């Protein structure tokens, strides 16, 4: 029996959106993505205790300063979890920069270089890592610098066409346009509470971005993220990559309904437009209330979970 997950793999690179090693072993994705929230939930799993202990020992060996130890411990823990995942996935791990640096280009660049150095020291080459950065103007500028250094980036918390366009123009390796969080916003801010997959505003957003990239010949990979239901995933079959949580991977694996490719650009490739200026980026992005609210909220939520992780690590330092 061919499952929907099997069919999806034939047209889209399937990525696991989790830090749970057991789930990754079960569904055998090509890549895996983590974020501060997933690192926090993974850290509560008993099999991760040795990784936390090792990160604490590493941090204590680096510095006698408690504040610095905390920074080093959280960076090392994120990398330790990534290293475990890389033992299973054949492709790449996405490890996220501290969300509190989202509006600081230089600090983002420095944090990314540090994470890469930790992976490199463990014998992992750059081509197996994506550095995840929020799609702020400052984050996109940081990614532009990093890409030129051979450090590939995954630009996340992407909700607007302006963000997508600026990422492509910066030569970013991959973007993660969010689907489910867009749907959440429309449900909360309109009278319409139910959406068929094809009319789901998150699905429409990713479809537009995918077609725009293909129409203008951008090489940036489109990886749909943040799904609320299987319908959103099947409606984006054919997208370059999709990063999917274990619960939805399970649903796809248990369903054998035929899957039809939905995304495939067959038109001609046009000349690229002039890159957006900073002023144009902010005008276009800020014209989309959903994108403004969801980007800010996403950064806040990741920062809260980063702080919870710090509280847990502080108790051990």
Curated annotation (Swiss-Prot):
Localization: Cytoplasm
User: What is one GO biological process annotated to this record?
Assistant: pentose-phosphate shunt
Pfam families, alphabetized: TAL_FSA (PF00923)
Which InterPro entries does the entry mention? Aldolase_TIM, TAL/FSA, Transaldolase_1, Transaldolase_AS
* Catalysed reactions, as listed in the record: D-sedoheptulose 7-phosphate + D-glyceraldehyde 3-phosphate = D-erythrose 4-phosphate + beta-D-fructose 6-phosphate
Keywords for this protein: Cytoplasm, Pentose shunt, Schiff base, Transferase
Q: Could you tell me which pathway this protein works in?
A: Carbohydrate degradation; pentose phosphate pathway; D-glyceraldehyde 3-phosphate and beta-D-fructose 6-phosphate from D-ribose 5-phosphate and D-xylulose 5-phosphate (non-oxidative stage): step 2/3
List the active site.
132 (schiff-base intermediate with substrate)
Annotated GO molecular function terms are:
transaldolase activity
Q: Which domain of life is it from?
A: Bacteria
Query: How is the quaternary structure described?
Result: Homodimer.
Q: Which PANTHER family match?
A: TRANSALDOLASE (PTHR10683:SF18)
| NCBIfam families named in the record | PRK12346.1, talAB
Task: Describe the task this protein carries out.
Answer: Transaldolase is important for the balance of metabolites in the pentose-phosphate pathway.
**Name recorded for this polypeptide:** Transaldolase
Q: Which organism is it from?
A: Haemophilus influenzae (strain PittGG)
Its ancestry begins with: Bacteria, Pseudomonadati, Pseudomonadota, Gammaproteobacteria, Pasteurellales
């Amino acid at each position: 029996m061919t499952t929907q997950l099997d069919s999806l793999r034939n047209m889209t690179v399937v990525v696991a959106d989790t830090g749970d090693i057991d789930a990754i072993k079960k569904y055998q994705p090509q890549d895996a993505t983590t974020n501060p929230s997933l690192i926090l939930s993974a850290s509560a799993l008993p099999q991760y205790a040795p990784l936390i202990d090792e990160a604490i020992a590493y941090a204590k060996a680096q510095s006698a300063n408690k504040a610095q130890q905390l920074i080093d411990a959280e960076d090392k823990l994120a990398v330790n979890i990534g290293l475990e995942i890389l033992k299973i996935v054949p492709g790449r791990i996405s490890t996220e920069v501290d969300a509190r640096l989202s509006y600081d280009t230089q600090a983002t660049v420095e944090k990314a270089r540090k994470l890469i150095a930790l992976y490199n020291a463990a014998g992992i080459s750059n081509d197996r890592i994506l550095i995840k950065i929020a799609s702020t103007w400052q984050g996109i500028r940081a990614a532009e610098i990093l890409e030129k250094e051979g450090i590939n980036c995954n630009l996340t918390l992407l909700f607007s066409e302006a963000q997508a366009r600026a990422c492509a123009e910066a030569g970013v390796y991959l973007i993660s346009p969010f689907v489910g969080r867009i749907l959440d916003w429309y449900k909360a801010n309109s009278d319409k509470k139910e959406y068929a997959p094809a009319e789901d505003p998150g699905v429409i957003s990713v479809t537009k971005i995918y077609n725009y990239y293909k129409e203008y010949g951008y090489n940036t990979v489109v990886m749909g993220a943040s799904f609320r239901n299987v319908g959103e995933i099947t409606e984006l079959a054919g997208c370059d990559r999709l990063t999917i949580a274990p619960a939805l991977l399970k649903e796809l694996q248990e369903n054998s309904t035929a899957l039809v490719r939905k995304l495939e650009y067959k038109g001609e490739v046009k000349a690229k437009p002039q890159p957006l200026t900073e002023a144009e980026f902010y005008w276009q992005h800020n014209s989309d209330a959903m994108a403004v609210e969801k980007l800010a909220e996403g950064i806040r939520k990741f920062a809260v979970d980063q702080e919870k992780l710090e509280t847990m690590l502080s108790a051990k330092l």
